[in-house]
Amino acid sequence: MARKKIREYDSKRLLREHLKRLAAIDLHILSAQVTESTDFTELVNQEPWLSSMKLVVKPDMLFGKRGKSGLVALNLDLAQVRQFVKERLGVEVEMGGCKAPITTFIVEPFVPHDQEYYLSIVSERLGSTISFSECGGIEIEENWDKVKTVFLPTEKAMTPDACAPLIATLPLEVRTKIGDFIRGVYSVFQDLDFSFLEMNPFTMVNGEPYPLDMRGELDDTAAFKNFKKWGNIQFPLPFGRVLSPSESFIHELDEKTSSSLKFTVLNPKGRIWTMVAGGGASVIYADTVGDLGYASELGNYAEYSGAPNEEEVLQYARVVLDCATADPDGRKRALLIGGGIANFTDVAATFSGIIRALREKESKLKAARMNIYVRRGGPNYQTGLAKMRTLGAELGVPIEVYGPEATMTGICKQAIDCIMAEA
């Protein structure tokens, strides 16, 4: 599962669109999205309610505590909303130690209310945890002892009996409505492959539940079966995270292939770089370098899997090598070309793309004093490893090559010893 945050606007859109289909509940919520490219005249034509109702406006940027941070404006008319957005659009703010400009807002009707409820659903290994409280709102953390929680195993349905412990202390006049709402939201959660959903708060409007603030995360590995249900969904980067040109290139490459190609720069001046096959193996290599005390020297996180073809691997390896060899400073560097024992991936085929990239970057590798450590197993691995050994002699670049007879992470210690030998 890959949990990806989505904007509040999309969380509410998905809930509104699918709650009726799955639970016969009409959710009368309205919302509009505002960005730098928004034409307010056109927006009002699409959403006429904006000009006739009192409004709420707030950033929709994947960070919380907006109310406590003074970033939520209430009971405004449209002109005031436009002014609020104008004063803050593109302005850098700091949240949770991360700084970034505000680029996206959500605008909604202002809903006066007295009671605030809390609801969250979290997907876990064996089921889902559903939490509910009658004391929702910005002080939910201070009132966490009042939150009721049930765990629902994956194979169990959210029946009225399963929901009953959450709503047992509610007044009778709202208990049934809120119980039906919780079960309906859970149906949407399951059907659309949410991994996390939170409403803090939701309230009651004319006797019907109404989400005021909402967060959602989707399992993006389920996109293949949900693309019609999700519609034009976006998975924004976490607040404060901006892709470098190299990362953007790999991200676009990843979007165009059925394979997985991931690349994140952690420390451009790091001296240990990775190009690892397999999602699990890539994490193990990074963790091992960190556990050995050299996380500060780790230049990147990189992973390729799903049997990418030679051309895709070539383009991928070019980017990794360009970053790994940038700005040589006379000190040794190390590149880990690692992986476990593949089940289906032709090791020789993927290594062919890497070898082509290594040949292209020969002068950069030498200038950066790069030492390369290879460990891999799987179909046709002997041929792939033999090609790597031959390449080392051909280029005059130090390449140490190991097969499945060696431990998977042994090359991490060798890489560290290499870069620290001169210290």
From Swiss-Prot:
Catalytically driven reaction(s):
oxaloacetate + acetyl-CoA + ADP + phosphate = citrate + ATP + CoA
Cellular compartments per GO CC: cytosol
Q: Which GO terms describe its biological process?
A: lipid metabolic process
Keyword Nucleotide-binding set for record = yes
Pfam short name (any one):
Citrate_bind
Which top EC class is given? transferase
Residues at which citrate binds? 343, 345, 376
> What keyword terms does UniProt attach to this protein?
Acyltransferase, ATP-binding, Cytoplasm, Lipid biosynthesis, Lipid metabolism, Nucleotide-binding, Transferase
Q: Name one GO molecular function term.
A: ATP binding
**Where is it mostly found?**
cytoplasm
Q: What does this protein do?
A: ATP citrate-lyase is the primary enzyme responsible for the synthesis of cytosolic acetyl-CoA, used for the elongation of fatty acids and biosynthesis of isoprenoids, flavonoids and malonated derivatives. May supply substrate to the cytosolic acetyl-CoA carboxylase, which generates the malonyl-CoA used for the synthesis of a multitude of compounds, including very long chain fatty acids and flavonoids. In contrast to all known animal ACL enzymes having a homomeric structure, plant ACLs are composed of alpha and beta chains.
Q: In which family does this protein belong, per the annotation?
A: Belongs to the succinate/malate CoA ligase beta subunit family.
Assembly state and interactors?
Heterooctamer of 4 alpha and 4 beta chains.
Q: What is this protein called?
A: ATP-citrate synthase alpha chain protein 3
